Amino acid sequence: MNPRIILTATALAILSVVLTFNTTHVFTPPPLPGSHDHLHTAEIIHLAGAVGPESLAFDPSGEGPYTGVADGRILKWQGHAHGWVDFAVTSSNRKECVRPFAPEMEHVCGRPLGLRFDQKTGDLYIADAYFGLQVVGPNGGLATQLVTEVEGQPLLFTNDMDIDEHEDVIYFTDSSTIFHRRQFMSSILSSDKSGKLMKYNKSSKEVTVLLRGLSFANGVALSKDRSFVLVAETPTRRIMRLWLHGPNAGNLDVFAELPGVPDNIRRNSRGEFWVAFHCKTGPISNWILSNPWVGKALLKLPLGFKKIHYLMVGGKPHAAAIRLSEKGEVLEVLEDSEGKSLRFVSEVEERNGKLWIGSVMMPFIGIYNLN
């Protein structure tokens, strides 16, 4: 018999035992070195009838945050007195967009992921997983589509972006040219390397592909001096750096190897980077992600999303984020190791001594006081 078949069968048998007996201690991710388990003290702000505040952005006046949710809306936080209000939508077809979470309707309702404000104009730029790169004015409403295809190929999974206001360009990612957002686990487990990093020129409307062959291209962040742009590769647990200017211009290197699965990257005012972890990685998840044949075999089993996700996060919801220097050095690690308050972090935005924390799966955001 083919050795690979035997190995696959053995691997799947082991995973079946783990899932059957709920042996979380076998594959629970260990604490991160030097971490502070303080995120459970975060203040929780619930969303009314909404789920999945993936990204958070503040407008030029400091109001917000604004966040995109799973039913295609973009909400604005107006403080505890007024709560969340509708600000914008990415699709005009809203008739059936009535459930907080309905993955089967995302292609109709839209799914806004990365958000960034142009601090000069007040326009909000949106990476919608299904409708591409969009923009909406300071007064909100229906977003306008800017980019829906590149090189004749539709954008299937627009994910995140950053804006270079000096050059008037937007760097953005398409996580996959094979899978849609609602199939993100298939992209991660199948060793899909069809992700791209692109540049959109706001004046000429031209799109340039900067990087191809990325593994689930995710979060994007421009350096403070604009010399390089970072892009997170989720399955490989690393952040890649593309040099834009200077003696290294055009070169690509590894900025950081991570002990978790990265989502969005956000730069703070000092030029450091907060990287959100959907989850830390443990023995089982590292093994799965490091051996594509295991992931592909998992996808063939009738496990369903919840059980596979359970495996990947180590059997226990938790939250983690890491702060990196401009050179990729670890400066700070924060956790909610028991998932008491926060879970499945998708973005960390530092503002005025606080961390505003989003989650692509939860019905709330968190505010953590750094002081």
Locations of the language-model features?
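Asp-box/WD-like beta-propeller blade repeats and closely related beta-sheet repeat scaffolds
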Residues: 95-113, 118-119, 123, 127-188, ...
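Residue-level detector of Asp-centered blade-edge/turn motifs that repeat once per structural unit
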Residues: 59-62, 117-121, 163-167, 224-226, ...
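Surface loop/turn motifs at the tips and blade-to-blade linkers of beta-strand repeat domains
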Residues: 44-49, 88-91, 103-108, 146-154, ...
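Beta-strand-rich domains and repeat architectures in extracellular enzymes and scaffolds
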Residues: 2-11, 21-24, 42-75, 339-347
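Short loop/turn segments that connect beta-strands within beta-propeller blades
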Residues: 78-82, 137-141, 200-205, 243-248, ...
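Short, conserved, GDST-rich strand-edge loop motifs in beta-rich repeat architectures
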Residues: 172-192, 278-315
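Blade/loop signatures of beta-propeller domains
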Residues: 9-43, 80, 318-327
